């Protein structure tokens, strides 16, 4: 009896899964149908969601946080002057802008006074090897003191940046000492807090998106199963007729 039942089930399964021209045609239609394409898109989207969720895991967050640790630019001596200037401006811009404006005014005023006292910059520029256009412009310019002061101002850029960084560092220490500026937490703790906040926001968005995709996938799966069952019924009916 068991053999008879097993053989009957086997015959029915072989009939349903047998590939004939008709079933092949229906299978191709099913593969080309919008529901089948939607199912493929949803499956690929589900894989993408899973991979993105894995990237947002605590392990990956710790790895990225450890790789992004940076020292305070005011105390970082490893980077160049320009990089320190940019990083300090990004972190302490509210303090650095007034300091830079004040020191720049003092620099330009000093150079303008030196030009009025007869400082001639042309021989120095020729000795250093500046382009002839710049040298002739200074030599024949009607602006006189202002242009000479501006040229000295640009030449002294490294010194100006160094003074600005020093003034910013002293200003930050003074403001923190008197309570006008809060002392920032260690870089590691700050980055961990930021990463946790970002992780929570991303996790919330991911859960919403995942739920929407799951609902759509279930609907598309149901439609696809109905179409597949209809095709199997048609194939089995035609086989019985034959």
Swiss-Prot record:
Its main location: membrane. Pfam families: FAM210A-B_dom. Residues 198-236 have a biased composition (Basic and acidic residues). Residues 57-78, 198-242 are annotated as: Disordered. SUPFAM superfamilies: Apolipoprotein A-I (SSF58113). It comes from the Eukaryota. Keywords: Coiled coil, Membrane, Transmembrane, Transmembrane helix. Residues 57-67 have a biased composition (Polar residues). InterPro entries: FAM210A/B-like, FAM210A/B-like_dom. This is Uncharacterized protein C18orf19 homolog A. The lineage of its organism: Eukaryota, Metazoa, Chordata, Craniata, Vertebrata.
